[in-house]
């Protein structure tokens, strides 16, 4: 392949198409997005924190192969690496990048779903990192998984997941989404809800370890364990969310104006996130995730919802006000003016009203 540039990311070096020669990353013959470096770094940390050695790791949509190569080089837990891409040019590049990093892998040139079905019951980790939606590959990912393991998926079709394209959202994810101030979290829970329902259909129970939003994508990593009876537990965390005049409610059946079906359970595991924070970068981001995961409410609040006289407290002030009122509150990574709280809307509103009234009386 012509017009390659040598790049470095994490602990590896690799060749990727030169975007300047192809008019951008989306026109290159093999896709590589440098904006996904954080995604790859966090996923590598997650594998390392997961802590089980000798893992069979499959990346069926490999592109340049950098994600899988980073897993092999940096995590210390990969026993066997399986890389695949439907593009012959990508496969050639994957082999080149494996060689310069001294990494062994099985490399395939197949349709991703065909390969996943061939790998039935043989993988510890399946990482779906497509251009667009992971939905077409989730069934195959579970079929490739052993009795237990990790399922990871990235979705860049965020506009679909947050309900901006209702028909496509219904077709692709089987959900109806209504716009809310916390639409980012709804989109993330929409993706998790879809994965949980597919998991149940394939007789797997899932436990999210890390889920987050980053600008142009959603990312989910979940532990999965096979067992039909346990798989039913997924539905204990599937529900609908209704938003009306600030009030948020969980509903266990669809009603007019509700969004769902969504995952309303935990978005991740604070313990594994704290482990990740101890061994790698993005510590501030990971701290926010760990704090968010400790609050069960499947939504967040935004400062403008509680503004009085055109003014609202700063985020730091808001969190302090709520904690002083006995309501546990933390920042959210999903909005710069957002916070999660374990209180109902009315309780949060009343805490702010008391704070504003007190502030006025001191003037």
UniProtKB/Swiss-Prot annotation:
S-adenosyl-L-methionine among keywords: yes
Keyword Nucleus listed: no
Gene3D superfamilies reported for this sequence: N2,N2-dimethylguanosine tRNA methyltransferase, C-terminal domain, Vaccinia Virus protein VP39
Pfam families documented for this protein: TRM
Domain Trm1 methyltransferase: 5-352
BP GO terms, sorted: tRNA N2-guanine methylation
EC code: 2.1.1.216
InterPro entries from the UniProt entry: SAM-dependent_MTases_sf (IPR029063), Trm1 (IPR002905), TRM1_arc_bac (IPR022923), tRNA_met_Trm1_C (IPR042296)
GO molecular function: tRNA (guanine(26)-N2)-dimethyltransferase activity; tRNA binding
Sequence positions that bind S-adenosyl-L-methionine: 40, 67, 85, 111-112
SUPFAM superfamilies xref list: S-adenosyl-L-methionine-dependent methyltransferases
Catalysed reactions, as listed in the record: guanosine(26) in tRNA + 2 S-adenosyl-L-methionine = N(2)-dimethylguanosine(26) in tRNA + 2 S-adenosyl-L-homocysteine + 2 H(+)
Keywords assigned by UniProt, alphabetized: Methyltransferase, RNA-binding, S-adenosyl-L-methionine, Transferase, tRNA processing, tRNA-binding
Domain of life of the organism encoding this protein: Archaea
Functional description taken from the UniProt entry: Dimethylates a single guanine residue at position 26 of a number of tRNAs using S-adenosyl-L-methionine as donor of the methyl groups.
HAMAP family: tRNA_dimethyltr_TRM1
Family (UniProt): Belongs to the class I-like SAM-binding methyltransferase superfamily. Trm1 family.
Name the UniProt record assigns to this protein: tRNA (guanine(26)-N(2))-dimethyltransferase
Source organism of the structure: Pyrobaculum aerophilum (strain ATCC 51768 / DSM 7523 / JCM 9630 / CIP 104966 / NBRC 100827 / IM2)
Gene: trm1
